[in-house]
């Protein structure tokens, strides 16, 4: 299992700082530009990266991320080409933690074990699958087994309306970090959920999972700073999607 995320969070915890973990789609608009974007993000202070693999039916994404995926796909983006961009990035950035974010079809089609190993070989540290339900991970252990065998973290998502019982279940599954949604629904809107982030973070702390990373795809990037203070080990921001 890679230790890049663990080492990053340990350093940040000592300084009581949150991580800046931006999200971008790989191969948008093409592999060369995509690689340059990753280089620029790290040079501009990104502590880690969440990298999307474009999909034709991004059910959880808003218009900006969907348009990004469409551009990449129109120029021939495939999972293999995306992993090649990551592989090239890794040659010059061996210490930057990277989580791949993609939809379940892109993992299931080649086979869970085959994909997980390919992702690890390309240099990924973690995989986040937004449409992989907690119940499926519990019923089909192949998902977690394949990730562990490849040396990858399989990150779990905590929705803002999660009950205490559900938070505990998710905390028992997640690896690497815990992805805390800041709102219910399609990303890129600016509507707060009814559940205060502080309550979810307290529940996570009681369950003692991996560090929470609060996802902020809000039109207001300043919201990430506030969440970082509530979840000091990790916080992230992405452009409105």
Question: What are these regions, as identified by a protein language model?
Answer:
Residues 31-43, 162-173, 208-209, 218-235:
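Catalytic cores of alpha/beta
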């Amino acid at each position: 299992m890679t230790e890049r995320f663990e080492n990053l969070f340990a350093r940040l915890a000592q300084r009581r700082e949150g991580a800046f973990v931006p999200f971008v789609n790989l191969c948008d608009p093409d592999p060369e530009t995509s690689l340059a974007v990753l280089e620029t993000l790290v040079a501009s202070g990104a502590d880690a990266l969440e990298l999307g693999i474009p999909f034709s039916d991004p059910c959880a994404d808003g218009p900006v991320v969907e348009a990004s995926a469409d551009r990449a796909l129109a120029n021939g983006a495939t999972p293999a080409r995306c992993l090649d961009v990551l592989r090239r990035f890794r040659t010059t950035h061996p210490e930057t933690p990277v989580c791949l974010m993609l939809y379940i079809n892109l993992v299931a089609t080649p086979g869970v074990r085959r994909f997980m190993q390919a992702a690890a070989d390309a240099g990924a540290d973690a995989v986040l699958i937004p449409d992989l339900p907690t119940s499926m991970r519990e019923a089909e252990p192949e998902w977690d087994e394949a990730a562990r065998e490849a040396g990858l973290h399989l990150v779990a998502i905590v929705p803002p309306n999660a009950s205490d019982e559900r938070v505990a279940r998710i905390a028992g599954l997640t690896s690497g970090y815990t992805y805390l949604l800041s709102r219910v629904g399609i990303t890129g809107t600016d509507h707060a959920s009814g559940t205060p982030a502080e309550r979810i973070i307290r529940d996570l702390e009681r369950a003692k999972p991996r560090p929470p990373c609060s996802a902020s795809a809000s039109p207001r990037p300043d919201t990430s700073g506030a969440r970082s203070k509530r979840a000091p080990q990790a916080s992230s921001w992405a452009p409105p999607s």
